[in-house]
Amino acid sequence: MAIEKSKLRLDGRHNLEKVLPLAAPYSIYLDPASACNFKCSFCPTGHQELVTGFYKRSIMSFSMFENIISQIGMFPCPLKVLRMNKIGEPTLNSCLPEMIGLARASERIEWIDFATNGSRFSGDNIERFLRSGANRINISLE
């Protein structure tokens, strides 16, 4: 019988009941693009009839992102995780590498990552993402 080891990183974790109320959030999910270039049957983002009434498909402006990073800087302690995706495909935002670079340069965010379908990675474009300052890029192959 094989013993499986958890892939969760448990080192440095806090028991929330001992640290509440929090002085700042541990993590924030931002959506640089609330649209997607795929229409996966299992994902609500690809179903126009499901999402029409719930959210507007759009691309976040760089100035809006700058404002958010500025506000994150006002927290009394650094943010542990910034996830640069939620509903949409983040690479649809052409400013994504620069956004990640700005977040990294703020020195107020410990870990930055995003998940992507990878369809927009090619040539020099992928170099921009690899040099952006992201700790991890998750490519979802569905």
Regions of interest found by a model, annotated:
Residues A2-I137:
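Conserved alpha-helical substructure of the radical SAM core
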